[in-house]
């Protein structure tokens, strides 16, 4: 069996990726989120497939087909809520995974990091289109507001929006194509994940000290497989508790009202995991400026490796950078809160200050802190 594991063309790939993979001996639980994201992706594809068997992508029947899934299909409500809350877990793990990368300097593995950012964009696009499918009030108005932002693009904006809509408003054509894209994107994400892993295994994992660990490696199995199983059990405990006790905790009550183009909800807002970007979008009075800020709020991650000025890779021994990092985390939590509030005083000014702080920390303060820490090391 050992020989087969090491010689069989297919098993050899699995062996080199998950069994005999040399891993640093000191990676902490912050390195668990990669495997958790993989588990979330598999869960989303499986539950999504079963939902697609009963869902109809038509404006007249979409809402009632979701109701049918919850009421008439055997354990349909479990599948539906696992899928909806699984998305929340997915983004929770994503944000922690990206945060880990920022803190420990994993972004210096350029290819792995950039594909990770593309994965983040693809996951956000998938989640947005999935939110439109139940065809509730927030689905319809969310789709209208977000797609309409593309009209801010000079010259081609309006044509682009109507092309995406498949008409002059969000309607049947929009829902059908969103369903098609929502179905195919997770498989594209899976392919990107394999490329992400391919590049990661070219360099090997980073570690909390941010130093080369070639002299002290241990096999991935059994050490990190067991460690990952603990993470999976913890995640499934949280997810199942959410699904079974409070499935609508993270959803919007407006989405239990069928979509009505003649009635605008008082507060149009996306799911919680988009609120920070939505707050940045709303903080700029100009439409095109807001759209650019929205895109840059994620795209800025691609510039982080080029803004790294410190001689140390990780923030483990860099207290000034640590302070800035945790201020950034607090700022993102503030932006998430602001994104869910109405556009009125004092929320407008708080959102604007938090948005400016977000970009200032990443573009200006972090590189300055790295430079200062280098200077203090000499001193």
Curated annotation (Swiss-Prot):
Protein biosynthesis found in the keyword field: no
Binding site for heme b b562: 83, 182
Membrane topology classification: Multi-pass membrane protein
Gene source species: Tupaia glis (Common tree shrew)
Tagged with keyword Amino-acid biosynthesis: no
Record-given protein name: Cytochrome b
Family, per entry: Belongs to the cytochrome b family.
Additional free-text comment from the UniProt record: Heme 1 (or BL or b562) is low-potential and absorbs at about 562 nm, and heme 2 (or BH or b566) is high-potential and absorbs at about 566 nm.
UniProt keywords, alphabetically: Electron transport, Heme, Iron, Membrane, Metal-binding, Mitochondrion, Mitochondrion inner membrane, Respiratory chain, Transmembrane, Transmembrane helix, Transport, Ubiquinone
């Amino acid at each position: 069996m050992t020989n087969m594991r090491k010689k069989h063309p297919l098993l050899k790939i699995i062996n080199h990726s998950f069994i005999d993979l040399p891993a640093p001996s000191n990676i902490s639980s912050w390195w668990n989120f990669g495997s958790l994201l993989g588990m979330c992706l598999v869960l989303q594809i499986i539950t999504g497939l079963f939902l697609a068997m009963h869902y109809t992508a038509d404006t007249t029947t979409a809402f009632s087909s979701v109701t049918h899934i919850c009421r008439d299909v055997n354990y349909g409500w479990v599948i539906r809520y696992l899928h909806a809350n699984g998305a929340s877990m997915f983004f929770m793990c994503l944000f922690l995974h990206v945060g880990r990368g920022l803190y420990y300097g994993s972004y210096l593995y350029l290819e792995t990091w950039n594909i990770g950012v593309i994965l983040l964009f693809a996951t956000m696009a998938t989640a947005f289109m999935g939110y439109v499918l139940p065809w509730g009030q927030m689905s319809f108005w969310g789709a209208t507001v977000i797609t309409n932002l593309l009209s801010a693009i000079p010259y081609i904006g309006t044509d682009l929006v109507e092309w995406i809509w498949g008409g002059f408003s969000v309607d049947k054509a929009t829902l059908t194509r969103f369903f098609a894209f929502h179905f195919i994107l997770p498989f594209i994400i899976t392919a990107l994940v394999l490329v992400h892993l391919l590049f990661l295994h070219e360099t090997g994992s980073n570690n909390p000290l941010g130093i080369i660990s070639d002299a002290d490696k241990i096999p991935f199995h059994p050490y990190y497989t067991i460690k990952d199983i603990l993470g999976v059990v913890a995640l499934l405990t949280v997810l199942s508790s959410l699904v079974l006790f409070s499935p609508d905790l993270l959803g919007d009550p407006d989405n239990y009202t069928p979509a009505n183009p003649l009635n605008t909800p008082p507060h149009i807002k996306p799911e919680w995991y988009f609120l920070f970007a939505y707050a940045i979008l709303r903080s700029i009075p100009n439409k095109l400026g807001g759209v650019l800020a929205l895109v840059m709020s994620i795209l800025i991650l691609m510039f982080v490796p080029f803004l790294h000025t410190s001689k140390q890779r990780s923030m483990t021994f860099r207290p000034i950078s640590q302070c800035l990092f945790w201020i950034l985390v607090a700022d993102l939590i503030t932006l998430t809160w602001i994104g869910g509030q109405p556009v009125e005083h004092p929320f407008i000014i708080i959102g604007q200050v938090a948005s400016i702080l977000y970009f200032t920390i990443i573009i200006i303060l972090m590189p300055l802190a790295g430079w200062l820490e280098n200077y203090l090391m000499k001193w």
